[in-house]
Amino acid sequence: MERQEIIRSIRDTAAGVMPAGSRLILFGSQARGDARQESDWDLLILLNHTGRTNNADFGRYAYPLVSLGWALDIEINPILYTDTEWQKRRITPFYHNVEKEGIVIWE
Protein backbone atom coordinates (compact mmCIF):
# COMPACT_ATOMS: atom_id res chain seq x y z
CA MET A 1 0.00 0.00 0.00
CA GLU A 2 1.29 3.45 -0.92
CA ARG A 3 2.10 6.09 1.70
CA GLN A 4 -0.79 8.38 0.70
CA GLU A 5 -3.26 5.48 0.86
CA ILE A 6 -2.07 4.68 4.39
CA ILE A 7 -2.43 8.31 5.43
CA ARG A 8 -5.93 8.38 3.93
CA SER A 9 -6.86 5.23 5.90
CA ILE A 10 -5.49 6.78 9.10
CA ARG A 11 -7.50 9.97 8.46
CA ASP A 12 -10.67 8.00 7.78
CA THR A 13 -10.23 6.03 11.00
CA ALA A 14 -9.52 9.20 12.99
CA ALA A 15 -12.60 10.91 11.55
CA GLY A 16 -14.73 8.07 12.88
CA VAL A 17 -13.44 8.13 16.46
CA MET A 18 -11.78 11.43 17.40
CA PRO A 19 -13.66 14.15 19.27
CA ALA A 20 -14.06 17.54 17.62
CA GLY A 21 -11.09 19.84 18.00
CA SER A 22 -8.58 17.03 18.44
CA ARG A 23 -5.50 16.62 16.23
CA LEU A 24 -3.51 13.72 14.84
CA ILE A 25 0.16 14.42 14.13
CA LEU A 26 2.50 12.16 12.18
CA PHE A 27 6.09 12.33 13.41
CA GLY A 28 9.29 10.32 13.13
CA SER A 29 10.73 8.83 9.96
CA GLN A 30 7.39 8.82 8.12
CA ALA A 31 7.05 12.58 8.67
CA ARG A 32 10.70 13.33 7.88
CA GLY A 33 10.54 11.37 4.64
CA ASP A 34 13.36 8.97 5.49
CA ALA A 35 11.20 5.94 6.31
CA ARG A 36 11.98 2.52 4.94
CA GLN A 37 9.36 0.00 3.92
CA GLU A 38 9.42 -1.66 7.37
CA SER A 39 9.35 1.63 9.31
CA ASP A 40 6.55 2.15 11.79
CA TRP A 41 4.04 4.99 11.81
CA ASP A 42 4.39 7.25 14.86
CA LEU A 43 1.25 9.23 15.66
CA LEU A 44 0.58 11.79 18.35
CA ILE A 45 -3.08 12.11 19.29
CA LEU A 46 -3.91 15.41 20.98
CA LEU A 47 -7.36 15.32 22.54
CA ASN A 48 -9.25 18.56 22.85
CA HIS A 49 -10.13 18.34 26.50
CA THR A 50 -8.60 19.21 29.82
CA GLY A 51 -7.42 16.81 32.44
CA ARG A 52 -5.56 13.58 31.97
CA THR A 53 -5.87 10.69 29.57
CA ASN A 54 -6.87 7.29 30.88
CA ASN A 55 -7.21 3.70 29.70
CA ALA A 56 -10.69 4.36 28.33
CA ASP A 57 -9.30 7.16 26.17
CA PHE A 58 -6.64 4.83 24.80
CA GLY A 59 -9.26 2.21 23.97
CA ARG A 60 -11.57 4.75 22.37
CA TYR A 61 -9.06 6.80 20.35
CA ALA A 62 -5.71 5.01 19.99
CA TYR A 63 -6.76 1.37 19.74
CA PRO A 64 -8.69 1.83 16.47
CA LEU A 65 -5.46 3.12 14.89
CA VAL A 66 -3.47 0.17 16.24
CA SER A 67 -6.13 -2.15 14.81
CA LEU A 68 -5.92 -0.38 11.46
CA GLY A 69 -2.19 -1.08 11.44
CA TRP A 70 -2.83 -4.77 11.96
CA ALA A 71 -5.31 -4.77 9.08
CA LEU A 72 -2.81 -3.00 6.80
CA ASP A 73 0.15 -5.10 8.00
CA ILE A 74 2.01 -2.05 9.27
CA GLU A 75 2.93 -0.94 12.78
CA ILE A 76 1.05 2.12 14.00
CA ASN A 77 2.25 3.53 17.33
CA PRO A 78 -0.13 6.14 18.71
CA ILE A 79 0.80 8.28 21.71
CA LEU A 80 -2.10 9.97 23.44
CA TYR A 81 -2.20 13.26 25.37
CA THR A 82 -4.78 15.88 26.16
CA ASP A 83 -3.91 19.41 25.04
CA THR A 84 -3.26 20.24 28.70
CA GLU A 85 -0.87 17.31 29.17
CA TRP A 86 0.94 18.15 25.93
CA GLN A 87 1.53 21.78 26.91
CA LYS A 88 3.11 20.64 30.17
CA ARG A 89 5.73 18.79 28.09
CA ARG A 90 6.96 21.90 26.26
CA ILE A 91 10.41 21.58 27.86
CA THR A 92 11.00 18.03 26.66
CA PRO A 93 13.05 17.01 23.61
CA PHE A 94 10.09 14.89 22.45
CA TYR A 95 7.84 17.96 22.35
CA HIS A 96 10.41 19.93 20.36
CA ASN A 97 10.96 17.08 17.90
CA VAL A 98 7.24 16.73 17.22
CA GLU A 99 6.82 20.49 16.88
CA LYS A 100 9.76 20.61 14.43
CA GLU A 101 9.08 17.57 12.24
CA GLY A 102 5.44 16.71 12.89
CA ILE A 103 2.78 16.88 10.20
CA VAL A 104 -0.84 17.38 11.21
CA ILE A 105 -2.72 14.78 9.20
CA TRP A 106 -6.15 15.19 10.81
CA GLU A 107 -7.95 17.88 12.79
Task: Please tell me what each predicted stretch does.
Residues 1-25, 31-37, 48-107:
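Catalytic core of pol beta-like nucleotidyltransferases
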Residues 41-46:
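Short beta-strand->loop micro-motif that forms the acidic, two-metal-ion catalytic signature
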